[in-house]
Every structure is written in structure tokens, then in C-alpha cells.
């Protein structure tokens, strides 16, 4: 990934991590969630911040299977930026994935019942994705992913971080890892861990 503010190192990254000993990179890139997605640092619609999506095509060195993965972080303020950003992202996933199995991850700053997430998962939309939580037969952990370093009461914590899949990926396990050591937090979000095949 690259920094969202300048396309180099400045600002937040929406990086993708992979095991180099397991996968070869076939192609990769990034685009901004804006009206000008190829312009580095462009801010979209009513967004408060620049937002970026990073993607990669990987080949498994063991099975030779290929996969497409994308990671993003939708705007926390602009509703239009989230809606338009997700439409752009779905178009790009469709265009770039070449029919490969797809994994999309990120902080969508949207709860499951929001119009943004409904658009992503709407089966009437040919570009739709499947929520890994809904697809998994094994689900563990809480139903929330954002806690603001423990400041939000348990019953008010929202689920805003997602893993979506498409094109034949089977979700074996889905979990939100909410355990902390000595009440310490590494982030204001909890990790979402998904096992697919």
C-alpha cells in the first residue's frame, strides 16, 4: 500500500499483508475513493479525509490458485463518500478481479443494517459480495468490532469492520478477537479473523 495523502508515504495506509513464502504477487495497485480515483490524495464527495483502496492478485505457491484481495477504509463522516466510495470499490473489484476468488476487507464505518452494507451484500446487484460472518458455520467473539479504546459501553459498540468474499471462497471460521491483556488495547478496533478455502 501507499499513504493516502500523497500516494507515497504520507497519511494512513490501507495495506495488505501476505506471506511471501506462500504467495507470489501477480499484480497490485491502489485507487482513491473519489471522483478522480487515479489522482493521489484526492478527497471524495463529502468525505472528511482522503480514502484509498489497495488491491493485490496473489498466486498460491502450493496450489497455483489465484486470488484477488482488496483492503479499504471508508470515510467516518461523509455518508455520500461512503455510498459513492463503495460503488466505486465494487466496480473496481469487478473490473480488476478477472473472475478470481475475491476477499475484501476493511473499516467500512457502516453498521450491518446501513444502506452501504446492504448495497455491498444485495444479491440483486451482480457485483455483490457475501459477508463472511453470514457465510461462516463457525462464528465466535462479540457482534461488535469498534470500542474506541474501551470507551464505548458493550451494548453500544458497533460492527463496522468486515470481511467479504465472492467467487467460490468457502468461509470456514469467522471470529472477532476482543480479548485484551491487562485491559490494554492495541487499537480502537478489534481484529476480525476469517479462515477461508
Region roles according to the model:
Residues 22, 80, 84, 93-102, ...:
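Metal-dependent phosphoester-hydrolase catalytic domains
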Residues 1-66, 176:
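Structured beta-strand-rich core segments of catalytic domains in phosphoester-bond hydrolases
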Residues 5-8, 75-77, 109-111:
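Short histidine/acidic/glycine/proline-rich micro-motifs that form metal-
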Residues 72-74, 106-108, 190:
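Active-site metal-binding loops of divalent metal-dependent hydrolases
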Residues 72-76, 82-85, 89:
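Hydrophobic, aromatic-enriched interface-forming segments
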Residues 14-16, 53-57, 71, 162-163, ...:
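Conserved hydrophobic/aromatic beta-strand scaffold that supports enzyme active sites
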Residues 33, 72-74, 169:
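Hydrophobic pocket-lining residues within nucleotide cofactor-binding pockets
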Residues 59, 88-95:
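A generic secondary-structure signal
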Amino acid at each position: 500500500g501507499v499513504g493516502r495523502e500523497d500516494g507515497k508515504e504520507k497519511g494512513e495506509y490501507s495495506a495488505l499483508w501476505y506471506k511471501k513464502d506462500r504467495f507470489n504477487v501477480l499484480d497490485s495497485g491502489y485507487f482513491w475513493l473519489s471522483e478522480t480515483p487515479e489522482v493521489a490524495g484526492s478527497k471524495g464527495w463529502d468525505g472528511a479525509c482522503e480514502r484509498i483502496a489497495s488491491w493485490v492478485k496473489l498466486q498460491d505457491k502450493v496450489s497455483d490458485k489465484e486470488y484477488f484481495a482488496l483492503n479499504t477504509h471508508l470515510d467516518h463522516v461523509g455518508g455520500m463518500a461512503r455510498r459513492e466510495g463503495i460503488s466505486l470499490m465494487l466496480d473496481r473489484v469487478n473490473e480488476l478481479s478477472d473472475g478470481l476468488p475475491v476477499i475484501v476487507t476493511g473499516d467500512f464505518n457502516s453498521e450491518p443494517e446501513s444502506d452501504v452494507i446492504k448495497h455491498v451484500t444485495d444479491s440483486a446487484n451482480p457485483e455483490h459480495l457475501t459477508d463472511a460472518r453470514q457465510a461462516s458455520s463457525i462464528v465466535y467473539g462479540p457482534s461488535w468490532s469498534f470500542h474506541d479504546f474501551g470507551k464505548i459501553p458493550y451494548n453500544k459498540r458497533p460492527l463496522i469492520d468486515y470481511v467479504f468474499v465472492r467467487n467460490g471462497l468457502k468461509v470456514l471460521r469467522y471470529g472477532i478477537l476482543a480479548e485484551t491483556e491487562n485491559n490494554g488495547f492495541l487499537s480502537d478496533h478489534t481484529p476480525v479473523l476469517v479462515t477461508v478455502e
